[in-house]
Structures are given as C-alpha cells and as structure tokens.
Amino acid sequence: SAEDAGRKAHRAAGSYTQALKQLTVGHDEQEFLDMFVLLMRKCYLRDIKEMYAWAERMATWGRERQKAFLDYALRLIRENFVYNFRLPQLNYLSQSEEEFSRNFARFVNEANVMGIAAELTSARRDIAQNVNARMVFFDFALKMIVLLIPPKA
C-alpha cells in the first residue's frame, strides 16, 4: 500500500541501501517483533515458566540471528521511548510495530530506558562472545520483569 511504502521510505531515512533492506527483511523482522511481543507479555505477567520456554526457543536460533534480534529489540525500545513524545516524525515504526507500541510505550520511560538498553547491549556482547544463549536470554528476560514493572515499595 502507499502508506506502507511511505513508512518504509521514512524508516530508510534517505538511504538507498536501507530502503532495499526494508524490502527484504520482512519475514525476519515480523518474527523478531512476535518474539519481542511474546517476551514483553510474559514479563508483564511474570510467567517465569513461559519466559524460560521463550529463552529455550531463542537458543535454537543461530548466533547471527540472535544478535540481529537483540539489535532489533534495542531499536524497538528506542522507538517506544520516542513514541511517548507524540512526535510521529521522530518514529521509525512499521505499522505492526506501531500497533504494539500504542499500548507498550508507556512501560518504557526515562526511569528504565537506559537500564533496558544496557541489558540488551550486554546480552548482545555475551552472545557475540559465545556465552550459553539459553542463560543469556533467560537472564535478560528475568531482568526485564524488574525494569518494566519495578517492585512496589
């Protein structure tokens, strides 16, 4: 559609290479979004058993794909933080990402955005250094519970 093409052009930010990439990454990006949404819902519900199952599934992916997912998740956290400013020209979200972000963005704020970004960066570094992926993803999932919904005092 014309709206979808406009979104992809906006996300490419004037880069021809990025525009071409936007046309070819659709399937992986949708699966990354699905896995991100699944994790965030399980974290919100504090469903430890399902979070472990999520980490198990992530561990079956290849290292490069795992790193690509973590890069994607970091971008999505940034976009959700910016989404709270209500300035659409600053956002680079696909339509499906924006639908998710309408409800999720309120959980990403100035109190936790740096912590979430640090955990994603740390997880990516650990994956790159060949640390056990199941441990890395489960540890990340557990930390997200506290970062997204801080314990009540």
Identify the role of each PLM range.
Residues 1-72, 76, 80-153:
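Charged, glycine-rich active-site and insertion segments that engage polyanionic ligands
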